[in-house]
Design a protein with these regions (language model features):
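Conserved alpha-helical scaffold flanking the Walker A/P-loop in AAA+ ATPase domains
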Residues: 22-25, 80-102
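Walker B catalytic acidic pair
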Residues: 104-105, 116
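Walker A/P-loop
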Residues: 24-65
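Canonical AAA+ ATPase core
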Residues: 79-84, 109-113, 121-177
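Pre-Walker A (pre-P-loop) alpha-helix and adjacent loop at the N terminus of AAA/AAA+ ATPase modules
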Residues: 1-41
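P-loop (Walker A) phosphate-binding loop of NTP-binding proteins
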Residues: 38, 72, 144
């Protein structure tokens, strides 16, 4: 139940009650969410703890300036069948083939790589070498983003922001928390 998950998360995350509530709404409505906040506010811990409490497969993708689309979606490799010695392509799935994806610092990678991730979010599949590969169900992307004014960021275009149903602002806990 949502209350059980919320209480599990509150054991790990101090404060951030509104953030926990909004993330749970995103998950239970089967939508993606973008968490915006400076580093060090437990965004990553929240998402990994959420996956654990829901018993879903979880992968973290650290978005960096040199990350390539195939690092996310997977790639085809040439495979030699030992019995026939015939060469063929074999698909190796990338980390996006998981139930909950933490797209960490999504605005630190160039637009081409962002687009590969965001297309998968929209279509819930990956197209490689002319073949479609369905993503698991359920499939959620919870992305983190540093504020745009920070150096070394690539702002997400409006069309890509539309892939996220929720933009959740993560701030420092107040004194009481």
């Amino acid at each position: 139940s949502a209350e059980r998950v919320k209480s599990e998360l509150k054991k790990v995350i101090i404060g951030q009650d509104d953030v926990i509530e909004q993330v749970l709404i995103a998950i239970f409505t089967r939508n993606h969410a973008l968490l915006v906040g400076v580093p060090g506010l437990a965004k990553t811990l929240l998402i990994s703890s959420l996956a654990e409490s829901l018993d879903l497969e979880y992968k973290r993708i650290q978005f960096t300036p040199d990350l390539m689309p195939s690092d996310i979606t997977g790639t085809e490799v040439i495979y030699s069948d030992p019995s026939t010695n015939e060469r063929q392509f074999k698909f190796l799935p990338g980390p996006i083939f998981s139930n909950i994806i933490l797209a960490d610092e999504i605005n630190r990678t160039p637009p081409k790589t962002q687009a590969a991730m965001l297309e998968s979010m929209q279509e819930r599949k990956v197209s490689i070498g002319g073949e479609d590969h369905s993503l698991p169900d359920p499939f959620f992307v919870l992305a983190t983003q540093n504020p745009i004014e920070q150096e070394g960021t690539y702002p997400l275009p409006e069309a890509q922001l539309d892939r996220f149903m929720f933009m959740i602002k993560v701030d420092y806990p107040n004194e009481e928390e």
